[in-house]
Regions:
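Short strand-loop junctions, especially beta-strand C-caps/beta-turns
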Residues: 40, 111-112, 117
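Conserved N-terminal beta-strand and adjoining loop/helix that marks the start
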Residues: 1-22
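Short, structurally constrained coil/turn elements
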Residues: 31, 63-65, 102
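Active-site-adjacent beta-strand/loop module that shapes the phosphate/pyrophosphate-binding cleft
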Residues: 6, 17, 73-97, 101-113, ...
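A short coil-to-beta-strand element that immediately follows conserved catalytic motifs
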Residues: 63-73
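Catalytic phosphate/metal-binding cores of nucleic-acid and nucleotide-processing enzymes, i.e., regions
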Residues: 1, 15, 34, 50-53, ...
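Conserved Nudix-box catalytic region and its N-terminal flanking loop in Nudix hydrolases
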Residues: 17-59
Length: 131
């Protein structure tokens, strides 16, 4: 029996003027009170960028104008049932998100300083020298 893959997308925003990254504090039953990124499940026939834009509108209140967007990573679960696409987006300056019910806080954090507790899936993404 073949199973379909659930695809999701997330975006890691970086402010050029402050050299800090945006993290959101999760408010959901899976991994509650952990720091993560804006993002979520890709719906219907959305492209990755369309899903990323929609998720930002839902979770941040708008899609920030980015200067550069780079695909950072595609994580696929061992059973191939889940794939998460992470993008890096640089913005000129920090912004204040209008959070929806999925998050209870946000923080812009300096490079190399990690918010705790971090969502377990995010740690492997951000913990490498290329970023």
């Amino acid at each position: 029996m073949e199973t379909s893959t659930v695809n999701a997308v997330g975006v890691w925003f970086y402010s050029i003027n402050t050299q800090r990254y945006l993290y959101l504090l999760r408010n959901d039953p899976r991994h509650p009170n952990t720091w993560g990124l804006p993002g979520g499940k890709i719906e219907n026939n959305e492209t990755l960028v369309e899903a990323m834009t929609r998720e930002c509108h839902e979770e941040l209140g708008f899609m920030p104008e980015y200067l550069r967007m780079v695909p950072l990573e595609k994580f696929t679960s061992a059973d191939k049932g889940f794939a998460y696409h992470t993008f890096f987006c640089s913005v000129g300056k920090e912004f204040i998100p209008t959070l929806n019910e999925e998050h209870i806080g946000y923080s812009w954090i300096t490079t190399g300083v990690w918010p705790k507790p971090m969502h377990p899936g995010l740690w492997s993404t951000v913990n490498f020298d290329a970023v």
